[in-house]
């Protein structure tokens, strides 16, 4: 697991209040981890803060798993 993926996973665990072993690469934040729309907004905000980046709304809507969040951050880090 990359350090970026570990950091993203830590944020998901903290924001959604789930156990670390529940957060797999393809677990859906909403369907598998019980997040609602507010949770996903707060999750994106936490990712933006952690990685000092801005995630446009149209991109944020596409992020629904750990793998997608990690891929987005890796592709958009300076």
From Swiss-Prot:
<feature type="domain" description="Carrier">
    <location>
        <begin position="2"/>
        <end position="77"/>
    </location>
</feature>
<dbReference type="GO" id="GO:0005829">
    <property type="term" value="C:cytosol"/>
</dbReference>
<comment type="similarity">
    <text>Belongs to the acyl carrier protein (ACP) family.</text>
</comment>
<keyword id="KW-0276">Fatty acid metabolism</keyword>
<keyword id="KW-0596">Phosphopantetheine</keyword>
<keyword id="KW-0275">Fatty acid biosynthesis</keyword>
<dbReference type="Pfam" id="PF00550">
    <property type="entry name" value="PP-binding"/>
</dbReference>
<keyword id="KW-0963">Cytoplasm</keyword>
<dbReference type="GO" id="GO:0009245">
    <property type="term" value="P:lipid A biosynthetic process"/>
</dbReference>
<dbReference type="GO" id="GO:0016020">
    <property type="term" value="C:membrane"/>
</dbReference>
<keyword id="KW-0444">Lipid biosynthesis</keyword>
<dbReference type="InterPro" id="IPR006162">
    <property type="entry name" value="Ppantetheine_attach_site"/>
</dbReference>
<dbReference type="InterPro" id="IPR003231">
    <property type="entry name" value="ACP"/>
</dbReference>
<dbReference type="GO" id="GO:0000036">
    <property type="term" value="F:acyl carrier activity"/>
</dbReference>
<dbReference type="InterPro" id="IPR009081">
    <property type="entry name" value="PP-bd_ACP"/>
</dbReference>
<dbReference type="InterPro" id="IPR036736">
    <property type="entry name" value="ACP-like_sf"/>
</dbReference>
<comment type="pathway">
    <text>Lipid metabolism; fatty acid biosynthesis.</text>
</comment>
<protein>
    <recommendedName>
        <fullName>Acyl carrier protein</fullName>
    </recommendedName>
</protein>
<keyword id="KW-0443">Lipid metabolism</keyword>
<feature type="modified residue" description="O-(pantetheine 4'-phosphoryl)serine">
    <location>
        <position position="37"/>
    </location>
</feature>
<keyword id="KW-0597">Phosphoprotein</keyword>
<dbReference type="GO" id="GO:0000035">
    <property type="term" value="F:acyl binding"/>
</dbReference>
<comment type="function">
    <text>Carrier of the growing fatty acid chain in fatty acid biosynthesis.</text>
</comment>
């Amino acid at each position: 697991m990359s350090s970026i993926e570990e950091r993203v996973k830590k944020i998901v665990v903290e924001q959604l209040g789930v156990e670390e072993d529940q957060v797999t690469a393809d677990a859906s934040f909403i369907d598998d981890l019980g997040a609602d729309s507010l949770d996903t907004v707060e999750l994106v905000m936490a990712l933006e803060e952690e990685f000092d980046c801005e995630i446009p709304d149209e991109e944020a809507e596409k992020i629904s798993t750990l793998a997608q969040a990690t891929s987005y951050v890796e592709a958009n880090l300076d």
